[in-house]
């Protein structure tokens, strides 16, 4: 079930990334001609547009989206490997027929919406899968941190300002 939960979670993350990218695309298009000062290592450089700046954030998130989609596609179900990964109980049920065990794995994977199962395992899937998913999520966090830091620095320079309401 962990792999199924990971796939569902990554799918939710993917959908949110698409929504953020869509919002940034609208923002970028709206401000594509609005000039602003560009920076290199937070030192004034040359004019860019606000829209161009937003496309830099979008590019990072697009790379993250590609990684999330790759990670979802690469997930493989554990299948029916048994308590030690040998499929011993299934081999007994299928009277030693390894092909029937493989077919059972294929059917389970297909039924659960996966392209395949891991070829070899112990009782559980490899924790390398957890590390790969964590790395993917870390990449999104890095992009969000860059985006947020840029906005914060631009607020300091009053390039970007928070709106204030009359009753605030």
Residue ranges and their predicted role:
Residues 15, 46-168:
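Internal glycine-rich alpha/beta core junctions
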